[in-house]
UniProtKB/Swiss-Prot annotation:
Any Pfam family matching the protein: CRCB
Topology class, membrane: Multi-pass membrane protein
GO molecular function, one term: metal ion binding
Record carries keyword Membrane: yes
Catalytic activity line of the entry: fluoride(in) = fluoride(out)
Listed NCBIfam families: crcB (TIGR00494)
Protein's job: Fluoride-specific ion channel. Important for reducing fluoride concentration in the cell, thus reducing its toxicity.
Assigned keywords, A-Z: Cell inner membrane, Cell membrane, Ion channel, Ion transport, Membrane, Metal-binding, Sodium, Transmembrane, Transmembrane helix, Transport
Example GO BP: cellular detoxification of fluoride
A GO CC annotation given for this chain: plasma membrane
Provenance organism: Helicobacter pylori (strain Shi470)
UniProt name for this protein: Fluoride-specific ion channel FluC
Gene behind this protein: fluC
Length: 130
């Protein structure tokens, strides 16, 4: 029997649990905003950093396919989710919180991309796998 689906499911359960935990730990008031989805924002930025780091290691074949399925597809797939990001943005727009919605959308995308780039750079330059 192929256990690849079980690895993905186990990783997804872990990632989803971590996402829920981080979401509950974050305050809803952030900087000057009364309502800001900081939990999802944090999860997406952290997840982008980690997937950048792990992506470089995967390309360099540092770990096997099973671990990649477990961690990248499962854990990170369960941990980060742009569907939650989309829903949170829509909710802000529906409440006419336009500045929060735009700040959230732009911040998630810009910092997420920066996180991927930094993760990739660190894996490439400090783990010593070129």
């Amino acid at each position: 029997m192929n256990f690849i689906f079980l690895w993905a499911a186990l990783g997804g359960a872990i990632g989803s649990s971590l996402r829920y935990f981080v979401g509950k730990m974050m305050p809803s008031k952030f900087l000057m905003f009364e309502s800001f989805p900081l939990g999802t924002f944090s999860v997406n930025v952290i997840g982008c950093f980690v997937i950048g780091f792990m992506g470089h290691l995967a390309v360099k074949k540092v770990f096997g396919d099973d671990f990649g399925i477990f961690f990248v597809t499962g854990v990170l797939g369960g941990f980060t989710t742009f569907s939650s990001y989309g829903l949170d943005t829509l909710k802000l727009l529906q409440k006419s919180q336009y500045i929060e919605a735009v700040s959230y959308a732009l911040g998630t995308n810009i910092l997420g991309l920066i996180g991927v780039a930094i993760g990739w750079f660190l894996a490439k330059n400090f783990v010593g796998i070129n």
